[in-house]
């Protein structure tokens, strides 16, 4: 590894050495020697030695079944430890340029100053700053919570070892602790034995809040406040709420039959319980700190005649929180609850705590007010009384099925067979009516009843407990109105954001037309109060049309929605359903946000954080602070220094690129007769369905083919065999087509001057760097019928041609020239991922030869899947 990454190299080497000790102790010198032989052969094979590559293949083929799992685990664990060392390095004091993000906020203020942006405009943009991260339980988080907790403790040890004044005995003790943690991880089961329930997933999300965000958000706000003070002369108002959290865990029932209304209710109770539990810890700490006597009349009034007024108020809060925990416990167990007052909204915490804060300032104790008390006040604004706001997500046809069954029962026809205009007339008429629509004597089918019961659960909650109701596969205005009607019929007493999710290429292209139709309806305009949320689907659009075409459709849809909302004086919040991989919209946060259309971040940012990306971006408080800094600086920059409007010739060329890339993508995925058999044979797609990752089935329709596969297993499968097909197919071909048509200069101009286009090419470069055509060929030879080999050859040839086309436009000699650290990081991992790929191909071969599944082979296969996911730094 390059010497400028010496501190990171040292940590990786130390962790690898300690892992080696653990393997020796657990399995003996012989197995460790075998692992080391494979590692060395992988390294020399990577350097270009065909002899060593063949030797590596033979070494892996010759492994007996009982050695497959420990060898796979050795490489998998090393990659997990490397990820931890790398994540730690980004926040360590030894972090080098190109590895760590520069100070994003300070860089932003320099740019604002250079562009003469006024203080007034900047202050206004800061006041409007809104970052809402939505934690989702997509089944991409391979690592079990058990393993994640151990990795967090390893991070703490690395932090201690970095201290320059650490004593020899303390260093020895910390290194010993590291070795213990690595041994604990080795002897723990790396793979879940059972598929997690939706409740397990929600608990995982709450653990992220407790272990990282509970500290990370107030830390970010404290740092951000100081930067604003330094640059603008005024900090964040005490009641500012620039960051808040939502969740889909326990609310996302799209294609997941296990998320029922009962589960949603249970998750919401658990969310409140966890919030009360965390606030109780804060309050207990404040009781120990705030022993002051002097106070204002307001605090004296709240405290009564107690000698220590602040403690008296805090003890009242402690009683409230204890009673809340007791009440929620009883509710979760289905027992009778007490009638004592409990925490129901954030104001119950805010008012007494804020009174204490103001009193301390008024009495000359501002320095005390600005300590732990301020952090707790910031938490009250960020997390409320419910920790996270829960979104509800359901597929559009589930709502129309309710109305169809109902209208047939009422004898007025079949709603599903009506024209769109007839549906809208019926829905608006019912929404405007004061009489109920649902008859008392109607007994719906179980599926329909579940949708109705979900709406009733929503109606029982407080508004601040809920985010938005997301309609997946939204296609028409009636899809949105139908949800409003069902919520109204359930007795929902507040206005809930109903958010259409436009996912496919056609739906994205029609999104403006759908919203214009909704805005033309008087009832709808009156109800939404000039605020609209729309969700842009990244994963399904890319699966439908390929990344280039989907990317342009997403951009065009955002632009059109911004335009129509501006004309209608409606405040638009765009909700981005991004994933961790390029094929699902993943990109470095800062670049991705700055590549969006002008004005698309005016209403703030709402974005899903999914699976393993939650851990990479938010898993440690310090890492979360970095992520929030990047989000905040990008949103402020996009709003104060918007990117250029694309020139007409750029748009025209993007239309061509989109059309050509979509056709190229679909010709393979839909038009190639051998594609589905090839996909099933050359990737672990069928085996992945057995992996106990998330609570949600891998297919929307269990009997369907590729088209019914969810976007996550679709991309996950291709990432495993290193062809990563969905993240590049069609894009390079379209670029080469445009070069051949004489547009190279225009492409180069777009690359230089248009953030949208340059970000797309940067994402492609990263994907190409992670691809391994040689490994994909090995999977073909080991696993597929010879009749399918020509398709594999064709795809790999296309990949090589695409790489040349992109490098040509960028005037680069090799991939990721502008990101040497990213390239180096991938190179380092490849030495450990390659043996896992070869092991996986061998395991798939052996498994598919057997009539009955061998638990031994299945376990080893699961370990390789987890290891490759860790090495690729993204799954689905």
From Swiss-Prot:
Catalytic activity entry: oxaloacetate + phosphate = phosphoenolpyruvate + hydrogencarbonate
Record has Transmembrane helix as a keyword: no
Pfam families per the UniProt record, alphabetical: PEPcase
GO molecular function, one term: phosphoenolpyruvate carboxylase activity
Cofactor(s) of this protein: Mg(2+)
InterPro entries referenced in this protein's UniProt entry, alphabetically: PEP_COase (IPR021135), PEP_COase_bac/pln-type (IPR022805), PEP_COase_Lys_AS (IPR018129), PEPCASE_His_AS (IPR033129), Pyrv/PenolPyrv_kinase-like_dom (IPR015813)
Role of this protein: Forms oxaloacetate, a four-carbon dicarboxylic acid source for the tricarboxylic acid cycle.
UniProt similarity note: Belongs to the PEPCase type 1 family.
Name of this chain's protein: Phosphoenolpyruvate carboxylase
Organism (species): Aliivibrio salmonicida (strain LFI1238)
